[in-house]
Amino acid sequence: MTTAELHYKIDWRASGHYPGHHASMQKGGGLQFRNHAALINAPDPRRFDVHASLRDPFEQVQVRVYRQTSAIPVYVIADLSASMSFVGASAKMHVMADFVAGLSDSATRTGDRFGFVGCAEATSDEWLLPATMNRAAGAELAERLRAYQPRGLSSQALLSAADSLGGRRALVFLVSDFHFPAPLLAQVLSALAYHDVVPVMLWDRHEHERLPRFGLVRVFDHETHGSRLLLMRPGLRRRIQERFAVQRKQLFDVFAQHGRLPLLMEDGFDADEVTRYFFG
């Protein structure tokens, strides 16, 4: 199976020592000029700067110092609660699996490490992948997700997911349908504030927009965390659509308060859509 190619970027300087693709705070062999330094402090005569040396009031030999490009950790924190079992135009877990496959492949090609934390009412070692450069690990994880039927009773473990990310700042993709209370989302985003968080919102138009006017429809019940059959009628259809519109506004308000609008996927996984999110 061919993995769709996607691209991402960060707007901050990485602090890691490992060479990679991203702008960094580290000195090294990159092409971006950082500053001048005395040769005794930066002993690389190949970068001797005659003009800076002549201007130096202390008559010290000056060399150019450059920034290296560094690698970063890239994580997916995934909601594995029961609402993620919804199947409409496509299964939400299939969309997540495609996204994980594309992101893990892109990360390892870029020189970044990819990790994964799956969350429901609790975290589980079964769904914990420490950040790794092993491309096969991401592909194997994606296939497991594709076959998985989530049954989690809540998304509460998202609150503690940051504990599994390590001490370095990471680019974190928070993947969920966010069918849980807005105050919990605000707490989750606050817990992840140290990291660069991209919310990935997996909705399906068959959940709300493309409901039939009449007929039997299987819907997810947020109170029982299970599915049930409803006899759809125009009034019920309108109420469901209004509820989704209110929820969408609440979610976007919380995301905006934390400085990042979501990457919305309503029509399945599209690698180009992910790339446009970062590069416009």
Residue positions per predicted region:
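Von Willebrand factor
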Residues: 134-170, 183, 202-204
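Von Willebrand factor type A / integrin I
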Residues: 1-25, 167-168, 180, 186-280
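A conditional alpha-helix N-cap/helix-loop micro-motif detector
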Residues: 96-97, 151-155, 244
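Short, contiguous clusters of charged residues that form electrostatic/catalytic patches at enzyme active sites
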Residues: 98, 102, 155-160, 249
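An amphipathic, basic-hydrophobic helix/alpha-beta surface used to engage anionic
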Residues: 1-126, 171-175, 181, 207-208
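Short beta-strand-loop
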Residues: 118-144
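Solvent-exposed, conformationally flexible loop/turn segments
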Residues: 42-45, 135, 267
